[in-house]
Amino acid sequence: MSGLPPGVDPVRVLREVRWRRNQFLSLLETLCRAESPSLDPVAHHAVQALLADNLAALGYAVRRLPAPRSGVHLYARPRRRRRGAPLQLIVGHYDTVWPAGTLATMPFAI
């Protein structure tokens, strides 16, 4: 059992992930190096834009929803979605939590 929806070939998924490995790692590094302290919503704009652009490139319609204390929530859903198809909900945060300048002492490494 692969945990994938019916009709999704796990070998094809793995091949795609391997093919895009460097692209994924580059995005991960860019996100990890982005200064976005929790209490500085303005600093979140670059990360929001990066995530929104990448989601849009994958075929998602992206909306920015006002959030009283954190600036903006990103809401993304597939532009083309089959009725009754499986859905996923991904919840996370994109602030680095630490004060500005802290990331300089935390080098990115895999």
Region spans (language model):
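Intrinsically disordered, low-complexity coil segments
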Residues: 3-6, 80-86
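N-terminal capping segment at the start of a domain
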Residues: 3-42
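Conserved small-residue
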Residues: 35, 76, 90-93
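A non-catalytic alpha/beta surface segment that caps or lines the substrate-entry region
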Residues: 37-84
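Residues embedded in well-ordered beta-strands
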Residues: 29, 75, 87-89
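Intrinsically disordered, low-complexity segments enriched in polar/charged residues with Gly/Pro
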Residues: 3-4, 17-18, 48-52, 61-64, ...
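Short hydrophobic/aromatic-rich motifs at helix boundaries and adjacent loops
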Residues: 1, 20-25, 46-47, 79, ...
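Active-site metal-coordination/substrate-binding segment of hydrolases
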Residues: 85-110
